[in-house]
Amino acid sequence: TQQVSSAASDVYKRQAPAYFLNQSHGFNSVHGRMPSIATGAAMANHDLLYLGISGDGDSASIGIGQFVHCARRQLNMTYIVENNGTYGLTKGQFSATNDLESKSKYGDDNLFPSIDLPSMAIQLGASFVARSFSGDKDQLVPLLKAALSHKGFSFLDIISPCVTFNNHNTSTKSYDYIREHNDSLSKPDFVPSGKEITTDYPKGSSVEVPLHDGSLLSLEKLSEKYDPTNKITAIQNIQESQRDGKVLTGLLYVDPDAKDLRDILNVSDKPLNEMEQTDLCPGSE
């Protein structure tokens, strides 16, 4: 059984490595630096299966430089972004993936267009790119399995509910939360328990998912006729869905003949961490 090495780079993803502790090794890296850790580990031992967990505040901002080079180098790993369009630590500040037309829960306008990470991943050379919704298990689980089995850089953008800071009618990424204010010195937050939101709809169709506050999340699933090996078509479909105010989900792009970083660098078949010092540094002779 192939082991899994998991690196999570956000304080809110700190539990992620624990989910894979059966025949796996996991640790947390500095925020925005998960790709560096994964690259070093993967180059030292290519026999492991590498899974990295990130967020939109990480991969689209402080860690965007590392995300860019991790994708273009075709590191053999699965890179997951848990995307909710907001920063929790700064109480609902827009992240770079928040849509231009989306207002904050305080009524503030978003002044900048969003960064679409799947489009960027395709343009950078990622050989497997997909987007899904955390409430659509039937679609998400197969995509995760396919990403983990793909040779090369696999990227998954997963629209993930924020239960606290992005659940209001003017948000395009609305989620279940309630916040109560009072005039006392302390202003406690109250997050009620709610029923998990799931959906199931056919390929090639779209659906509006009602959220707990009455707002709607519009999803569109790729059809059977869609060709995921066409890079230009993939980017065009993503942009068209953005224009229509929809979130395109499914396998957006895949290169079945892609080379990974080890092939590009012509690294030895024997893992570097199993070599002797004389093999790693043979000297000038």
Predicted features and spans:
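Short beta-strand segments
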Residues: 10, 53-54, 78-83, 157-159, ...
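ATP/nucleoside-binding phosphotransfer catalytic cores, i.e., glycine-rich phosphate-binding loops
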Residues: 217-285
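Glycine-rich ThDP/TPP pyrophosphate-binding loop and its adjacent helix/strand module
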Residues: 62, 66-77, 82, 86-228
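N-terminal cationic-hydrophobic initiation segments that often serve targeting/anchoring roles
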Residues: 40-42, 71, 148, 239-243
